[in-house]
Regions:
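Active-site-proximal specificity loops/subdomain of glycosyltransferases
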Residues: 37-71
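Conserved catalytic core of nucleotide-sugar-dependent glycosyltransferases
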Residues: 97-162
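GT-A fold catalytic core of metal-dependent nucleotide-sugar glycosyltransferases
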Residues: 64-112, 125, 134-135
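Extracellular structured ligand-interaction cores
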Residues: 66, 129-132, 191-193
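A glycosyltransferase accessory/donor-loop signature
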Residues: 2-8, 35, 41-42, 136, ...
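Short, acidic, metal-binding catalytic loop of nucleotide-sugar glycosyltransferases
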Residues: 28-36
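Short N-terminal binding/cap micro-motifs at the start of the first secondary-structure element
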Residues: 17-23, 186, 203
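Hydrophobic targeting segments
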Residues: 7-12, 29
């Protein structure tokens, strides 16, 4: 394990479209701690494709968390986070959660199902996930090649790997991260980390996320302290990664009274549509391509599976 004087290492799973979101996350982490910190984006890592496309990554970084021990030199411990997050408390609180003999620490429970699943773009049920993890890199001998080979050999499938961590014994998994450190589409006075997990309504691509004001406020602080320039924001918009109306939200959103907010959001959504903006276009194109690859695979194999599904 790392000593007290060593940096807290936070590895962030992302693709190119989320790099600015990583910067916003990093800013929020640093703003709430004076600990030594390293935030390492994981973008376009060399990850082999499983033979069965049904076992392929759902995003460009789904398997990135399993690359962390090797990236860390199999030394010390590390935190994994997704890019679509914002932190409101000292990261040391998460860092100091004990492993209690386990190799990883993941989320304990999923709260507020009854309200967050009613939100536009939300799933019907939220599952326990590993979007925030503590990893003891010294005790995890993972290589992404061997993990993908396990799927190719039919030992497990994507869901078993990602959601059940089937490559670990149950004793190696500590369910010690409270919901407040992976608060799915929910924020209150106890929230430590807000996770904008619903792709359809992330505040940089959708006008109307009920907790988008937190993200906009962080961006305003970055513009004020010089860690972000207006030209950086405009570049992401020009590339199609962020919605055109985001600039209006950043500039004026905090000045809009509550009773006018819905109209403001509807206006922004209309403006984005008129501008031809398609949220997460590359993600949805990749999803379609994955569907085609699965169909071709099933036709070629007669419906048999090389990945245990």
């Amino acid at each position: 394990m790392m000593g007290d004087g060593e940096a807290i290492r936070v590895y962030v799973g992302a693709d190119r479209s989320q790099l600015l979101a990583v910067s916003v996350l990093e800013h929020s982490i640093k703003r709430h701690t004076n600990a030594k910190l390293q935030v390492i984006p994981m973008v376009d890592l060399p990850v082999p494709k499983p033979l069965d496309p049904r076992n392929g990554q759902r995003t460009g970084f789904s398997f990135s968390r399993f690359c962390i021990p090797r990236l860390a030199g199999y030394k010390g411990k590390a935190i994994y986070m997704d890019a679509d997050m914002l932190v409101f408390r000292d990261i040391r609180e998460l860092w100091q959660i004990p492993f209690d003999g386990a190799k990883v620490v993941i989320q304990r429970e999923v709260k507020h199902q009854e309200t967050t699943t009613r939100k536009e773009g939300a799933p019907s049920k939220r599952i326990k996930q590993c979007a925030v993890m503590l990893l003891d890199c010294e005790r995890l001998n993972w290589t992404i090649e061997s993990l993908v080979s396990g799927m190719d050999d039919g030992k497990y499938d994507y869901e078993q790997l990602m959601y059940q961590l089937c490559v670990l014994d149950e004793a190696d998994v500590n369910y010690g991260i409270p919901f407040e450190w992976n608060s799915l589409e929910h924020a209150d006075a106890d929230t430590r980390l807000l996770h904008y997990t619903d792709v359809y309504t992330q505040p940089w691509t959708y006008a109307g996320n009920p907790f988008g004001d937190r993200w906009f406020a962080e961006v305003r602080l970055m513009l004020q302290d010089g860690s972000l320039r207006g030209s950086d924001l405009r570049r992401e918009i020009e590339l199609g990664y962020f919605r055109p109306s985001l600039v209006r939200d950043i500039r004026f959103g905090h000045l809009v009274p509550g009773f006018l907010r819905r109209g403001f959001d509807l206006y922004n959504r209309g403006a984005d549509k008129a501008a031809g903006f398609i949220a997460h276009k590359a993600v949805y194109e990749a999803k379609k391509e994955r569907g085609r690859a699965i169909q071709e695979y099933l036709e070629r194999t007669g419906g048999t599976s090389a990945g245990g599904v």
